[in-house]
């Protein structure tokens, strides 16, 4: 039985239409009871596991940014919008949920887009004991603030220049591209804002 919006349960003509088609009240009731057994209850252990996995992924992304700030970005601070890494981690988990090995089969390439140029920051292998089944390319975006470059101009001259290094501000936008390694079809692009 397929439920549609064209039949109204309060309309006597609809009920007689169902009876004329061979549906009897007992079979309708058993059809509804069927869904009670098919739709599973949410498993609390899975929810807790997913939360801890999400938090671990958030820490991996934050560590990547922390390592890259002095080595590859040449700055003393990276300011990340609130919940940005959390949103990215949730999208990564969602994209990995349909994969054969899940998140364990993921290799993530982390980049930063500065003035339309992508700079490679890191490569994260989620589980080195599993052959990768898909790649994710994460592109953080720099916030376009004119005041930061104006401030850097003033502090780059004079006595503050030796000790002061710029602060990089990330935008709340990002791009996440999924590429399946076992299939020619199936590139997925997510633009976060």
UniProtKB/Swiss-Prot annotation:
Induction: Up-regulated by oxidized LDL and hypoxia in macrophages. Up-regulated in atherosclerotic plaques relative to healthy segments of the same artery. Coiled coil: none annotated. Signal peptide: none annotated. Pfam families: RTP801_C. Keywords: Cytoplasm. GO terms for biological process: negative regulation of signal transduction. It is found in: Cytoplasm. The keyword Lipoprotein does not apply. InterPro entries: RTP801-like, RTP801-like_C_sf. GO terms for cellular component: cytoplasm. Its main location: cytoplasm. Belongs to the DDIT4 family. PANTHER family: DNA DAMAGE-INDUCIBLE TRANSCRIPT 4-LIKE PROTEIN, DNA-DAMAGE-INDUCIBLE TRANSCRIPT 4 PROTEIN DDIT4. Inhibits cell growth by regulating the TOR signaling pathway upstream of the TSC1-TSC2 complex and downstream of AKT1. This is DNA damage-inducible transcript 4-like protein. The gene is DDIT4L.
């Amino acid at each position: 039985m397929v439920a549609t919006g064209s039949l109204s349960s309060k309309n006597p003509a609809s009920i007689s239409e169902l009876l004329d088609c061979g549906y009897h009240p007992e079979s309708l009731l058993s059809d509804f009871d069927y869904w009670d057994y098919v739709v599973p209850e949410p498993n609390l252990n899975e929810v807790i596991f997913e939360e801890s996995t999400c938090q671990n992924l958030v820490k991996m992304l934050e560590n990547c940014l922390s390592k890259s700030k002095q080595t590859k970005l040449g700055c003393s601070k990276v300011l990340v919008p609130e919940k940005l890494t959390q949103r990215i981690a949730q999208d990564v988990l969602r994209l990995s949920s349909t994969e054969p090995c899940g998140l364990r089969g993921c290799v993530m390439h982390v980049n930063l887009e500065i003035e339309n140029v992508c700079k490679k920051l890191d490569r994260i292998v989620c589980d080195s004991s599993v052959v990768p089944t898909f790649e994710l390319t994460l592109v953080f975006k720099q916030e376009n603030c004119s005041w930061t470059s104006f401030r850097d101009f003033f502090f780059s001259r004079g006595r503050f220049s030796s000790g002061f290094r710029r602060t990089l501000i990330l935008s709340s936008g990002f791009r996440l591209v999924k590429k399946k390694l076992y299939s020619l079809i199936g590139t997925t692009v997510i633009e976060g804002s």
